[in-house]
Amino acid sequence: VGFKAGVKDYKLTYYTPDYDTKDTDILAAFRVTPQPGVPPEEAGAAVAAESSTGTWTTVWTDGLTSLDRYKGRCYHIEPVAGEENQFIAYVAYPLDLFEEGSVTNMFTSIVGNVFGFKALRALRLEDLRIPPAYLKTFQGPPHGIQVERDKLNKYGRPLLGCTIKPKLGLSAKNYGRAVYECLRGGLDFTKDDENVNSQPFMRWRDRFLFCAEALYKAQAETGEIKGHYLNATAGTCEDMMKRAVFARELGVPIVMHDYLTGGFTANTTLAHYCRDNGLLLHIHRAMHAVIDRQKNHGMHFRVLAKALRMSGGDHIHAGTVVGKLEGERDITLGFVDLLRDDLIEKDRSRGIYFTQDWVSLPGVLPVASGGIHVWHMPALTEIFGDDSVLQFGGGTLGHPWGNAPGAVANRVALEACVQARNEGRDLAREGNEIIREASKWSPELAAACEIWKEIKFEFEAMDTL
């Protein structure tokens, strides 16, 4: 046929509505808002082209490869209900386009270049279907839910955590003291805040030492296994690994990483080290809202959550649901299930666009954290179930009597809710009553109930379908 130079419509090559997707394809659902006058097929094809083999003009070197084998294909387009100029474009990518075991490469391909594309007003990646063939090239979470429970010897209830506040400004010794008080009071974990790295007022090594001392002391006194998420996030991968190695030498059970600001390459490196050395890995999602908060541009958090399960982490922050809207509850539980379960069926009412089979990748514990306190405990226990971590920062340290009583109040509230649930009571309906009953024999809980009885965070949810 010979080479024909010039610009031709993307849809002639990249829009293939009769394509049958393969079991090995990576499938993506994009919410596309084209510029006025750009037809949906062209916009969808442009996304497929620019995120795979295409460029703005035909090139001579196209003839040196098999485009049919390597090109992304826009295979289906559907309008978004209630939106005038918006639709979901489904794109299939051949597996050969991606490096094995690299979340970094997967994202660079699928979302690396196409979001600045002029023909689109906005673009959002709503969901990905990762085929088992690709998942098998990833290690995934270092340990997973069952192994974590066995390491900690804690079963049949959610785990309790607390972020140490004020997050910045404490000396290492005072920080360790707060850790000890919380763990001694009954929490399972305490946590470095995401931006606690190694600052002038508290260098990382001092913090690690005092926190390790605190958790061993609390362990000896309570007879329970305790942990503190030591944040290993650093300016270079080498420094990050140095911190993880020191944590292992101290014999602590868990370290932490900010996976979006730290980057997927660093995160996967750390996850591999954690599995090889028996460390649990707690993941904080700092910066996620920059990417996922806008409804029509960016990436939904469920995609970032899937990427984390591939890259590796044993816990990840996943919102709280409580005090927000019902619609948001279904969507949050959608990606919570994506983190925990082995197989998740397609369910558009929960924002899940594809059936996802995780084959052998362990599950991740969702962490509920942010503005929660003892009155939320029944709802949190009901919504998240046993396989979760409930984290109360201010809800522990803000107790009028101090840190340890704050921890006691949370532990009593949790045990009361779990017992009530196991006895068949309805936490959604009887939650307040259950907390009131428990507070009669726990002065710490009674004081917490009194101080937070009026607090509400009532804003409309951003994350709706």
Curated annotation (Swiss-Prot):
Binding residue positions for substrate: 113, 163, 167, 285, 317, 369
GO cellular component, one term: chloroplast
InterPro entries, A to Z: RuBisCO, RuBisCo_large_chain_AS, RuBisCO_lsu_C, RuBisCO_lsu_C_sf, RuBisCO_lsu_fd_N, RuBisCO_lsu_N_sf, RuBisCO_lsuI
Record note on cofactor: Binds 1 Mg(2+) ion per subunit.
EC number: 4.1.1.39
Compartments where located: Plastid, Chloroplast
Residue list for modification N6-carboxylysine: 191
GO-annotated molecular function: magnesium ion binding; monooxygenase activity; ribulose-bisphosphate carboxylase activity
Predominant location: plastid
Annotated site location: Transition state stabilizer: 324
Reactions catalysed according to its record: 2 (2R)-3-phosphoglycerate + 2 H(+) = D-ribulose 1,5-bisphosphate + CO2 + H2O; D-ribulose 1,5-bisphosphate + O2 = 2-phosphoglycolate + (2R)-3-phosphoglycerate + 2 H(+)
Key words, A-Z: Calvin cycle, Carbon dioxide fixation, Chloroplast, Disulfide bond, Lyase, Magnesium, Metal-binding, Methylation, Monooxygenase, Oxidoreductase, Photorespiration, Photosynthesis, Plastid
Positions of Mg(2+) binding: 191, 193-194
Residues annotated as catalytic: 165 (proton acceptor), 284 (proton acceptor)
Cofactor(s) of this protein: Mg(2+)
Residue positions, PTM N6,N6,N6-trimethyllysine: 4
Modification after translation (UniProt): The disulfide bond which can form in the large chain dimeric partners within the hexadecamer appears to be associated with oxidative stress and protein turnover.
Domain of life: Eukaryota
More details: The basic functional RuBisCO is composed of a large chain homodimer in a 'head-to-tail' conformation. In form I RuBisCO this homodimer is arranged in a barrel-like tetramer with the small subunits forming a tetrameric 'cap' on each end of the 'barrel'.
Function: RuBisCO catalyzes two reactions: the carboxylation of D-ribulose 1,5-bisphosphate, the primary event in carbon dioxide fixation, as well as the oxidative fragmentation of the pentose substrate in the photorespiration process. Both reactions occur simultaneously and in competition at the same active site.
Family: Belongs to the RuBisCO large chain family. Type I subfamily.
Assembly and interaction partners: Heterohexadecamer of 8 large chains and 8 small chains; disulfide-linked. The disulfide link is formed within the large subunit homodimers.
Official protein name in the record: Ribulose bisphosphate carboxylase large chain
Native source species: Daphniphyllum sp
